[in-house]
């Protein structure tokens, strides 16, 4: 069985890693869709798709990496066509993992089976919160996997975020 998990991963954090592990506990293969892949260097989408891909790959244990495939999902500004757009990019999947209510509605309209991902401390483990902590020079390192932290340090995320 194959599953789909879509997120912007701005940045990839421990909540996302938990969602990946949860997804892989339910399916053999997990397709990870990097949403808004065509957007970067913006306040809401500061990291490029390649940087986000590197954060994901460097954060996932080598023992499970072969069960994951990553796809770029650029935005289409048409909600009615979005699921069809996703389906044109990723291979067939049996389950969709999401906690986003709007994403759930869109996929369920297309007869997809949606599984909610158990969340812990959603406000703490949110990209918006983590980006703000980086800008404010507060501790954010404990909220992201070590692999993602290395990528963020390498690309000087702090400087980029402060300049946006």
What are these model-derived regions, one by one?
Residues 1-164:
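Nucleotidyltransferase catalytic core that binds NTPs
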């Amino acid at each position: 069985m194959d599953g789909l998990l879509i997120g912007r991963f701005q940045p990839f954090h421990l909540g996302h890693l938990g969602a990946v592990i949860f997804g892989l506990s339910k399916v053999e293969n997990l397709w990870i869709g990097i949403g808004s892949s065509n957007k970067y260097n913006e306040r809401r989408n500061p990291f490029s798709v390649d940087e986000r891909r590197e954060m994901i790959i460097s954060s996932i244990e080598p023992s499970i990496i072969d069960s994951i495939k990553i796809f770029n999902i650029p935005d289409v500004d048409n909600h009615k066509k979005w699921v069809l757009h996703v389906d044109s990019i990723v291979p067939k999947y049996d389950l969709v993992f999401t906690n986003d209510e709007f994403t759930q509605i869109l996929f369920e309209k297309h007869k997809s089976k949606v599984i909610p991902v158990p969340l812990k401390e959603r406000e703490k483990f949110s990209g918006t919160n983590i980006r703000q902590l980086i800008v404010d020079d507060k501790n954010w390192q404990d909220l992201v996997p070590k692999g993602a932290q290395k990528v963020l340090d390498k690309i000087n995320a702090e400087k980029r975020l402060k300049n946006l």
